[in-house]
Amino acid sequence: MIQTNSIFDKINFNGGNLSSDGGSILLSQFLEKMNLRKLLDSIPFVDLRHLPVYSNTNILFQQIIKCLLGYNDQSDQKILINDPLMSLKSLICSQATVSRFYDRVSLNTTNEFKKIITQLACDFVNTNIDDPILDADSTMVTTCGNQEASAYIHHYQENGYHPLVINEYHSKLLLSSLLRTGSAYSSNGIIEELEQIFTQLNNTGNIRFRGDSAFYRRDLFKYLENNQVTYYIRVKNFKKNIRESVMDMVMNRVNWNDFDYTEPYYGEYTIQINKTKKRRIVYKAFRLEKDGMLQLVPMVYCIITNDFEKSPKEAMDFYEARGNSENFTKELKDDFNGGILSHKEFVKNEVDFLISSLAYNLYHVFQQTILEEKDQTIRMNTYRLKYQKIAVKVIQHARQVTLSFSSAYKNKTQFIQYWNKVLQI
């Protein structure tokens, strides 16, 4: 039998000037120190309003803050309006105002927005990363109904958009975030995106690029070689490549039945492009068993590279480490709502995707600048639980504002340390 007695006589939600997002001051103060609003001022909009109460920059800034805090629906705008901490520094606009904001975006808006994301990320990488590693990947954003530019994507067996993302491996930052139509091939736009990145990124011959077999393109190889970029790209499963790998093992008298998945054989051979240029194929091979019987031909897994210094195993291990970058994309989609785009018009969805991308980058810049030790590896959702969702009372008296946090908060020592670091920027 369910016990209905309670030690509480009444409950209500009329607690006064209380906020459940007290820890949001860390990120909001950090963004003020970065002068983010000034950067956003350069984004153009098709705005015919006369003496608007809210500028487009103000509304966009609110949407970025909202994304960082994990409020992903337009209806969540009411939470910001009613929150005594969120509405303390600036007037929060209504949900209807946000909806009309999206009517003023255009292709010029998204182009300039994208440039800002690339510029911020490249500036951080140039300052903090000595040997950048660029990981390119395509992903999927599921669509519903008749959303513009949505298409069936055979690889995912679903309708959706097909974004292209390029992360810098050490910093996790998105150097490029391109929302593409559902009909776009996985590597469409890769050279154009790299061109934009290389105008901002310091290149002293120390940049490395990794991509899966979708990026196995001769024009991409040539472009990267011309820009002194070392690349590691998975080779498509052409019969010719498998045959060449098997022949190399035969020539070296290797019995592939002596190698399994946990301990494969690593080998290499070269491809002559012209009289002066070669490319290197690195492969690993191992036996396959099916129904208790060994297959006649080994399983062969190849990458192509212009790196002739690493051993075959080192080159293969370096390529396979790119799998961690797929977790960065998962964080973008899951923790920053980049996997849900609900507008009918494509350009509006592109703005939402860029908001998620910028929020993702801002968090990781904040993480590497302010957070310490194990906190430098936590995902955004973990950060929100640990440092954002703190009960706080907002007290305004004699032109002063005091934030009175819960005394039961267990991470207060670390929080105060992070707060002081933000103030010192």
Regions found by a protein language model. Name each.
Residues 139-141, 171, 180-182, 238, ...:
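Short, glycine-/Ser/Thr-/acidic-enriched flexible segments
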Residues 30, 77, 140, 312-351, ...:
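Short amphipathic alpha-helical "interface-anchor" segments enriched in bulky aromatics
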Residues 18, 49-58, 294, 343-353:
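Structural motif
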Residues 1-200, 224-227, 367, 390-425:
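Dynamic "connector" segments at or just before major functional cores
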Residues 2-7, 230-334, 414, 420-425:
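An anionic, glycine-rich sequence signature occurring as long contiguous blocks
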Residues 339-400:
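Basic, amphipathic alpha-helical segments enriched in Lys/Arg and hydrophobic/aromatic residues
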Residues 137, 206-215:
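Acidic/histidine-rich, metal-coordinating catalytic segments
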Residues 218-222:
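Catalytic cores of alpha/beta
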